[in-house]
Amino acid sequence: MANQTLTFEIGTEELPAFALHAATEKLGGMFADALDGAGIPHGEISVYSTPRRLIVSALAVPEATEALTETFRGPAAKIAFDADGNPTKAALGFARGKGVDASALERRDENGVEYVYAVKSTPSVQVITLLPDILQNLITSIYWPRSQRWGSRHEHFSRPVRWLFAMHGDAVVPVEFAGLTAGSTTCGHRFLAPGPWEVASADALIDVLREHNVVPTEAEREASIREQVAAIEEKTGLVAELPAKTMAEVVNLAEFPTVMVGEFDELFLAVPKEITVDAMLVHQRYFPLFNADGTLANKFLITSNGDPKFEANIVDGNQRVVAARLYDAKFFYDEDLKRPLEDYVERLDTVVFQEKLGTTRAKTDRIVALAKAIAADAGATGQEAADAERAAYLAKADLVTGAVVEFTSVPVSYTHLTLPTNS
């Protein structure tokens, strides 16, 4: 029997980045379990993913399963049959458990004791007849934090499924799902090479995708992004901040990532860099750029999934987006500076810390008491003790400022950013 590669692709609308990563990590194991459960031998399994597709591929999948004969020893014959030779409950239960008829049980002598045996024969089956159900079940078994239905369909998936590709060697596996039947065509990059594109065999799918502007693995897309960022850093003399969490999301937002440089008005540099960086990283998935001395530059990196020919338009659109976000940040920061931090402390009464422990204002009083006790134990007096008490009093004031309400990852540093100016 010839062994062939089996490749299955689920083509979709853009999948959520973190959910896609989680599904990618589990898909290989799920596929292996499904093949093993059906008695289908296979070689190495590979998983590929982009925002618009999940692909799983297994090497060395045979055309047919092997014919199998299994022999199972059961209870002693004197227990399995009564005096008249009729099967007892023990024999009936054993036969039922092994999937054979009690009349087919055999008696065999073993060291002077007669036992009953069940011989179970499983014929060879063409693998391509088993695969449609296996692959359909694989689709429905993928876990998504949130799923949706589309059109008039009852099936659900993380995002609408638009095409299916399934081939074993050069034979199409007719998997059906959500009104679609798998074929031998795939789609390339949505804008650069949409397709559809004919694929000659299961082995050829990944090469066809690469030829049509699809980078099929997270690792390759991340390497491409980092290489492009390094080239920009060398050209500009600036340094990019590439947090792992943001990078993990960005690699699953583009099938063919192109890194571009955007710019914002220098007036936003007056806003604490923590707020500006938060606005870019957390809210827009832009990578900030810093000068060699560590100060924030008025430039940022865009990871685009669009056509590089339209870079000017893409950059302009993203600059408009970041400008709107930074105008908001500057507005909230400027408004926060109009009042001393002490004014915000009393508003902490509106923030519940924990139902049984009261508000954050009550927590502030406890922090102040702790600060006094620690200062006294440390022998602090005069200005040192007063500074400790004041720091404790203001520690949570930033939680009700406009900037922190709008940019929720900022509070760890926002108090010290505003303190020199407005207190």
Where are these regions (language model features)?
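Long, basic N-terminal domains or extensions that often function
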Residues: 2-266
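Glycine- and acidic
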Residues: 9-17, 117-121, 210-214, 230-235, ...
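Conserved small/polar residues in nucleotide/adenosyl-binding loops
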Residues: 415-421
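Inter-helical turn/loop segments and adjacent helix faces that build the functional surface
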Residues: 236-237, 374-384
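Metal-dependent catalytic cores of enzymes that make or break cyclic nucleotides
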Residues: 403-412
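Catalytic nucleotidyl-transfer cores of nucleotide-processing enzymes
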Residues: 161-162, 175, 241-359, 365
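Alpha-helical scaffolds flanking conserved acidic
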Residues: 381-397
